[in-house]
Amino acid sequence: MAEYFFDTSAFVKRYHPEAGTQQVLALFSNPKNRVVISRLSLVEMQSAFAVKVHTGEISQSTAAMLWIQLMADLSSGAFEVLPVTDGHYQVAGELIERYGFRHRLRTLDALQLAVGLDKHHQAGVDGFVLADQALAEVASAEKLPIVFVS
């Protein structure tokens, strides 16, 4: 079974059609794949839906329906949610210290990467799925296998 850790930049594409959506749907639809996200992604998804409402991409009622769908997917086991621990915060700080001056590594991206790295070191992941080029560069430098969706 292949396991994929999704950053929110890619995960959002499951719920809102945009560049890279077909790649994301293909990963989800393969029964041999296991999808994992961090708890942070749930909050980031709420924010992503709110931004899409604010910019007029979707209506507030559509955002509510997308959230209901996401919660239904969570309940059905379509993906696993990993906790964010104190250790992840520490690693995120170390990643920012190591890469923040040369790369555009933002706080929440560093935290996502810390969770993904932890999962990779514990059990291995077949791909860190993302749509953020700056984060992809840092993840690659950390030897995570990258699946870039765009």
Predicted regions, residues:
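Short, well-structured N-terminal submotif of metal-dependent ribonuclease cores
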Residues: 1-41, 52-65
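Short glycine/serine- and small hydrophobic-enriched flexible loop segments
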Residues: 47-54, 117-121
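Acidic, PIN/NYN-like endoribonuclease modules and their adjacent C-terminal/linker elements
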Residues: 1-3, 117-150
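Active-site neighborhoods of divalent-metal-dependent phosphate/nucleic-acid chemistry enzymes
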Residues: 78-131
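Alpha-helix capping/helix-boundary segments
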Residues: 11, 41, 88, 112, ...
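Aromatic- and histidine-enriched alpha-helix N-cap/loop-to-helix transition segments
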Residues: 37-43, 108-111
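Helix-adjacent hinge/juxtasegments
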Residues: 51-86
